[in-house]
Amino acid sequence: MIDAFFIAGTDTDVGKTVASKAILQALGAKGLNTIGYKPVAAGSDKTAEGWRNSDALHLQKAATLDIAYDDVNPYALELPTSPHIAAKHEHVEIKYEVLSEKLAHHKEQSDIVLVEGAGGWRVPVSDTDSLSTWVQQEQLPVVLVVGIKLGCLSHALLTAEIIKADGLNLVGWVANRVNPGTEHYAEIIDMLEDRLDAPKLGEIPYIPSAKRKDLGKFINVEPLLNA
């Protein structure tokens, strides 16, 4: 069984956190000790405890192990924009070694760590680096979240292609229905099943306020446990 994996999205706002929560809930139902890890988050609110990102908070709550927020999300950036822009404006340097130290600690504590990305695969974290470079360094297996909408086929196939070109293992994908009005849904799923060289872990239907719901029933985590 893998001890950590990375959640990538075909774009921003495709439901990475929804899928991450669903996977964490499904893993927890198997009796596994889990940690949700959001290394970099852009778009945070000031609280009495410090800056907090809502997606990172959902991961913190969905995991079975209770760890400090700063360990879930070491870089909570205020501005809701590309991480490299937010970091520059906030005079923050995102350091790979910090991300790696946290990940190593999480692996020691848990059975499996879910690492959620930010934006799409090549999202920059500085003027020269992307989060995907760190994922390559860590050699994390990848689960791809596909937001089912017009244009998702090209985005999904291109993202899967570059993940493999980067030398990483695509261990599964999740279909998340972000637009209930998307036509030809079944045909889109059929094409993804045919063209993506990885098992489908599940389909999450369109659900209002999905991040607040029990979603584990939509996910089959056996391919992850056998990877």
UniProtKB/Swiss-Prot annotation:
Enzyme class: ligase
CDD domains per UniProt: DTBS
Keyword Cytoplasm: yes
Binding locations of ATP: 13-18, 55, 116-119, 176-177, 205-207
Catalytically driven reaction(s): (7R,8S)-7,8-diammoniononanoate + CO2 + ATP = (4R,5S)-dethiobiotin + ADP + phosphate + 3 H(+)
GO biological process: biotin biosynthetic process
Keywords recorded for this protein, A-Z: ATP-binding, Biotin biosynthesis, Cytoplasm, Ligase, Magnesium, Metal-binding, Nucleotide-binding
Binding residue positions for Mg(2+): 17, 55, 116
Residue positions of the active site: 38
EC number, UniProt record: 6.3.3.3
Keyword Aminoacyl-tRNA synthetase: no
Metabolic or biological pathway, per its Swiss-Prot or TrEMBL entry: Cofactor biosynthesis; biotin biosynthesis; biotin from 7,8-diaminononanoate: step 1/2
Subcellular location: Cytoplasm
Main location: cytoplasm
Highest taxon above the source species: Bacteria
Record-level Gene Ontology MF annotations: ATP binding; dethiobiotin synthase activity; magnesium ion binding
Cofactor(s) required, per the database record: Mg(2+)
Family that this chain belongs to: Belongs to the dethiobiotin synthetase family.
PANTHER family found in the cross-reference section: DETHIOBIOTIN SYNTHETASE
Stated role: Catalyzes a mechanistically unusual reaction, the ATP-dependent insertion of CO2 between the N7 and N8 nitrogen atoms of 7,8-diaminopelargonic acid (DAPA, also called 7,8-diammoniononanoate) to form a ureido ring.
Subunit composition and interactions: Homodimer.
Protein name, as recorded: ATP-dependent dethiobiotin synthetase BioD
